Amino acid sequence: MSELDQLRQEAEQLKNQIRDARKACADATLSQITNNIDPVGRIQMRTRRTLRGHLAKIYAMHWGTDSRLLVSASQDGKLIIWDSYTTNKVHAIPLRSSWVMTCAYAPSGNYVACGGLDNICSIYNLKTREGNVRVSRELAGHTGYLSCCRFLDDNQIVTSSGDTTCALWDIETGQQTTTFTGHTGDVMSLSLAPDTRLFVSGACDASAKLWDVREGMCRQTFTGHESDINAICFFPNGNAFATGSDDATCRLFDLRADQELMTYSHDNIICGITSVSFSKSGRLLLAGYDDFNCNVWDALKADRAGVLAGHDDRVSCLGVTDDGMAVATGSWDSFLKIWN
């Protein structure tokens, strides 16, 4: 037996020991604990607005912190800022690269960011003196596509990439201040903790990792999915997070228990998940699927509580407003829909 095989065997044994140790600590399951809680009942949401304006597949969307404005990115090479109350377009920003995969709204509302197959995170200033929107920074440093980005504040942004890394950037200098390495596959998604000191990432190595923003180190690694993790989202209290994967399941992982608490799946759901988001209370988990639907799960009981059906193609992105009053879904059918 070669040294490599021996090491592989040892690693496998260690993994099993860790799994057994975790099992020994888990004295109850979430299902048992939540058994006597009333089910949420049937969730029926209606489409309140349809945002029309993109001419091709929508790949990403992100709400502003005011719960009114949102940004969307499409294959048509446009970044559009929408007023969800009136359905008006506040800005339509032409992009240098139409191969965009992600977009983000800064908490201040002053900036938006986007990126994709150009490997660059482009920052746009919405509040210039002249009133026009222009590129204020292009953050180049990743050697693979940009899959996700999220602002910490007006001068810091975290990005994830197909080069298997995540990075923290100083926008003013345009430099990576921290690189987060450890995944062995393309990093597909990231989510900031409510206090922005930590973030989680999901990758094509089927694992999720918890990172310390300031120290640049991986705190925890979570396994369980059988295929690529496409989407990840923190639980509102910051103690857990949900993932969505090509294995047709969503899962809930707890930071303190250091393991998976729940799987959200159904025999007749056989397609991958593209996006996940929690309701404001955390009781509902919304997930967008390749089969054109968005399923609403009871996060505590893993029952399907509702379906948002209204798109004619894959639901590629979704988001719940900060005030918890509305959900937006974006699709390859080129439309965004606002539900509540």
Curated annotation (Swiss-Prot):
Coiled coil: none annotated. It holds the Pfam family WD40_Gbeta. InterPro entries: G-protein_beta_WD-40_rep, Gprotein_B, Guanine_nucleotide-bd_bsu, WD40/YVTN_repeat-like_dom_sf, WD40_repeat_CS, WD40_repeat_dom_sf, WD40_rpt. Transmembrane segments: none annotated. The modification Phosphohistidine is found at residue 266. Phosphorylation at His-266 by NDKB contributes to G protein activation by increasing the high energetic phosphate transfer onto GDP. It comes from the Eukaryota. The keyword Cell division does not apply. The modification N-acetylserine is found at residue 2. Keywords: Acetylation, Phosphoprotein, Repeat, Transducer, WD repeat. WD repeats lie at residues 46-94, 95-140, 141-181, 182-223, 224-267, 268-309, 310-340. Belongs to the WD repeat G protein beta family. This is Guanine nucleotide-binding protein G(I)/G(S)/G(T) subunit beta-1. It comes from Pongo abelii. The lineage of its organism: Eukaryota, Metazoa, Chordata, Craniata, Vertebrata.
